[in-house]
């Protein structure tokens, strides 16, 4: 058997193996949901959003939108083992900075944590919204003046979006402090970014509000302009989070 033939056979087997892995390995990127009842029989909705490197989970009353819990940080998937570095946790700040590894199983429409017996259904896979990913607030305009901030500092305001869901979180990894969060659904149509708020940790009266903003991408930055849920003018700059 010639060396050329052997090399060709090895090459074909390698390509076939890579195609097999691609077909049967699933990505968690997108949004997932789970409904369950707490000890009082209250229905709780849990939403997880994965960007390419970051994730967040939020739990809230499925009917009233009352905020209950959130945590999040970075993630990596090796086989069926997911490793997370915790950046915020509303129930236990001492978990901030911890690295946690656990088993997950992912199919096209289900994500399960066997050890916890948690089972999530897929909402989307990162589409169709234009802004899927993790973003950090990097600046804003006040009285026409552009004011920038260092996104490498421990105090961050992050917004993580799938193709249809969003969650913003303000936190400080150095002080292990959680500042606030909110989230819901969003759309991006003809330069308009629209949010429907489903939970808001600081003020539950914001639940159910719909907000519309102008948006565009300039040199990789998300320019976000409109009014806050309080009705105040807003003109923010968000940069895509890399680290």
Segments and roles (model prediction):
Residues 1-31:
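Bacterial Sec-dependent N-terminal signal peptides
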Residues 183-187:
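Beta-propeller blade signature
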Residues 24-76, 81-181, 192-243:
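Lipid interaction determinants
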């Amino acid at each position: 058997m010639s060396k050329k033939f052997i090399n060709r056979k090895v090459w074909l087997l390698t390509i076939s193996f890579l195609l097999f892995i691609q077909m049967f390995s699933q990505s968690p990127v997108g949004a997932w949901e789970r409904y369950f009842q707490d000890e009082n029989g209250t229905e709780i909705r849990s939403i997880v959003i994965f960007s390419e490197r970051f994730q967040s989970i939020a739990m809230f009353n499925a009917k009233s939108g009352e905020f209950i819990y959130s945590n999040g940080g970075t993630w990596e998937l090796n086989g069926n083992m997911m490793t997370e570095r915790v950046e915020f946790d509303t129930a236990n700040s001492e978990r901030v900075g911890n690295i946690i590894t656990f088993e997950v199983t992912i199919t096209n429409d289900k994500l399960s944590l066997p050890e916890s017996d948690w089972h999530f259904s897929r909402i989307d896979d990162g589409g169709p919204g234009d802004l899927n990913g993790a973003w950090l607030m990097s600046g804003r305009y006040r009285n026409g003046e552009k004011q920038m901030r260092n996104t490498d500092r421990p105090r961050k305001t992050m917004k993580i979006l799938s193709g249809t869901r969003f969650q913003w979180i303000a936190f400080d990894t150095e002080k292990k402090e959680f500042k606030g969060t909110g989230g819901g659904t969003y759309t991006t149509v003809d330069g308009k970014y629209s949010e429907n708020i489903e939970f808001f940790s600081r003020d539950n009266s914001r639940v159910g509000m719909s907000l519309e903003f102008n948006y565009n991408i300039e040199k990789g930055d998300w320019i976000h302009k409109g009014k806050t849920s309080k009705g105040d003018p807003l003109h923010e700059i968000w940069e895509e989070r890399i680290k």
